[in-house]
Amino acid sequence: MTNGNGTPPEGAPSPQLNVLAQYTKDLSFENPNAPSSLAPQQKPPSISVQINVNANNVAQDEFEVTLTVEGKAEHNDKLMFRFELAYAGLFRIVNVPQENLPPLVMIECPRLLFPFAREIIATAVRDGGFPPLMLDPVDFVGMFRQNMERQAAVQQKPS
């Protein structure tokens, strides 16, 4: 509840987002063509990366948010490496209006997880014999909006 100007009334409990835990749920790195894939290449490989966010309400005010990052590098249609990471966090969110929960859970929580997931992937790729893969920043706001638009389109389709 607000006092009319968008701020909570004086004495109202303030919103809180707490990170209770962060953990790797699944990590896979494949280098199926080693050692030939480790030889110097004339041009850089083609790299593709897919990122998804899932969230589950696991207890009152607690959400498990999982950031899934899958990717591969190919050179001349030959797989150099492939990786998959499911990195999750357990978040406690209190004193937040129900209508504000989805963006908080699907934007802010993955934004907090991403730097850790990025480091895990960079290290796994480096340990696989390649230069570390530094993932570009992710627009979680854009991902959230696309998902909302997709859901709205599905709901508007006639049965």
From Swiss-Prot:
Claim: Chaperone is one of the keywords in the record: yes
Entry keywords, A to Z: Chaperone, Cytoplasm, Protein transport, Translocation, Transport
Cell compartments where the protein resides: Cytoplasm
Record bears the keyword Protein biosynthesis: no
GO terms, molecular function: unfolded protein binding
Gene3D superfamilies the UniProt entry points to: SecB-like
GO biological process: protein folding; protein tetramerization; protein transport
Pfam families assigned to the protein according to its UniProt record, in alphabetical order: SecB (PF02556)
Entry GO CC: cytoplasm
Record-linked PANTHER family: PROTEIN-EXPORT PROTEIN SECB, PTHR36918
Family: Belongs to the SecB family.
Subunit structure: Homotetramer, a dimer of dimers. One homotetramer interacts with 1 SecA dimer.
Function: One of the proteins required for the normal export of preproteins out of the cell cytoplasm. It is a molecular chaperone that binds to a subset of precursor proteins, maintaining them in a translocation-competent state. It also specifically binds to its receptor SecA.
HAMAP family to which the protein is assigned, alphabetical: SecB
Protein name: Protein-export protein SecB
Organism: Nitrobacter hamburgensis (strain DSM 10229 / NCIMB 13809 / X14)
Gene transcribed to yield this protein: secB
